[in-house]
Design a protein with these regions (language model features):
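C-terminal accessory "lid"/substrate-recognition subdomains
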Residues: 2, 142, 146-277, 285-309
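Nucleotide-state-sensitive switch-loop elements of NTP-binding domains
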Residues: 2-14, 18-133
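Phenylalanine-focused residue identity feature
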Residues: 11, 65, 73, 85, ...
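Flexible glycine-/small-residue-rich
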Residues: 36, 125, 261-263, 283
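A residue-level signal for conserved active-site and pocket-lining positions in enzyme catalytic cores
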Residues: 38, 121, 179, 231, ...
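Short, intrinsically disordered/low-complexity patches at protein termini
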Residues: 56, 67-68, 113, 169, ...
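Small-molecule kinase domains that catalyze NTP-dependent phosphoryl transfer to phosphate-bearing small molecules
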Residues: 121, 140-143
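Charged helix-capping and loop-helix junction motifs
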Residues: 136-138
Length: 309
């Protein structure tokens, strides 16, 4: 029996990992594999997904659709094909442009044989930030253009008017794709029993992902506790200059929390002990952001930290 293969796309912070966790819960009696891709070298989402019952491969430091990682992705798919999974989910980086997926799947077939049944590309669209993201990065349009199903997230915040705006934008880009809505991963998952590829709109094309277009990522490491109010002030200073910030911090009086920043929205969620606090920045300004990180951290937090590429 062939492995059912799904691709999850969606710009940074759209809720891919949340949705994937919900799908894994609903398939907990199945043999499942996950390929998880992040633009930086430290995998925050991989840490969230890690589970003894799930076999996971992490491909970091680039997009799996870029020449810098494409061959690694093909080989990972070929290797996973030998493990007789019932389902394999690929969660791509938020900046991933999947326009060349057909080419990649053909290469996997040459290496590993006809082991996969591709069920479809699912793209998540953040109702709060989608329109701004669409203007900022071409990958957002490509993700919608090449998806079979779009899932609009966070419409509980924007309401029906916000949902309709995003729906209309999606249909302008891809008139064929199926569109659903999800709030915090809650939705009808009956699509897992369907062939989403019937909703195909665009033909394969060259991905816009390249070494030259890869955004700068930086990693802040910090030992000890930090006050949530001070950390929040620092994060607020940085929101205009980043696509995304995410990580883990030991908050004074609160314990360990997962920190997630998309647009102006800052979320804290309790999590297990991670040893050292860390934060990933995906910069809109390239290396120019480094000076601001140091100056704002010193002003708002005032404790020693280390910043790495």
């Amino acid at each position: 029996m062939k492995t059912k293969l799904y691709l999850l796309t969606g710009f940074l912070g759209s809720g891919k990992t949340t949705l994937l966790l919900e799908m894994l819960k609903r398939l907990d009696n199945k043999k499942i594999g996950v390929i998880q891709n992040e633009i930086g070298k430290i995998s925050i989402d991989g840490e969230i997904l890690r589970n003894d019952d799930i076999q996971m491969v992490e491909l970091n430091r680039g997009s799996i659709f870029c020449s810098c990682l494409k061959l690694n992705f093909v080989q990972a798919l070929a290797d996973m094909a030998e493990k007789d999974f019932e389902y394999l989910f690929v969660e791509s980086s938020g900046i991933g442009d999947p326009s060349n997926l057909d080419e990649i799947l053909k290469a996997v077939t040459v290496i590993a044989g006809d082991k996969y049944e591709f069920k479809g590309a699912i793209c998540l669209a953040d109702a709060i930030n989608f329109e701004n993201q669409l203007e900022e990065d071409e990958a957002v349009e490509r993700q919608i253009k090449h998806c079979n199903m779009a899932i609009i997230t966070k419409s509980d915040v924007t309401g029906d008017e916000g949902f309709e705006k995003v729906l209309n934008k999606i249909k302008e880009i891809n008139p064929i794709c199926r569109v659903e809505k999800s709030v915090n991963g809650v939705m009808d998952y009956s699509f897992l029993d369907e062939d989403l590829i019937q909703y195909k709109w665009a033909e394969s094309e060259e991905s816009t992902n390249s070494v030259e277009t890869k955004p700068k990522t930086l990693f802040l490491n910090f030992e000890g506790e930090v006050e949530q109010e001070k950390l929040t002030a620092f994060l607020e200073d940085m929101t205009d200059d980043v696509y995304r910030m995410k990580g883990f911090f030991n908050l004074k009086g609160e314990g360990w929390n997962q920190v997630d920043v998309v647009g102006k929205k800052i979320d804290y969620k309790p999590c297990s002990d991670k040893g050292n606090s860390q934060l990933v920045f995906i910069s809109k300004k390239g290396p120019a952001i480094i000076k601001k990180i140091f100056s704002s951290w010193e002003e708002r937090v005032g404790l020693e930290m280390k910043l790495k590429n």
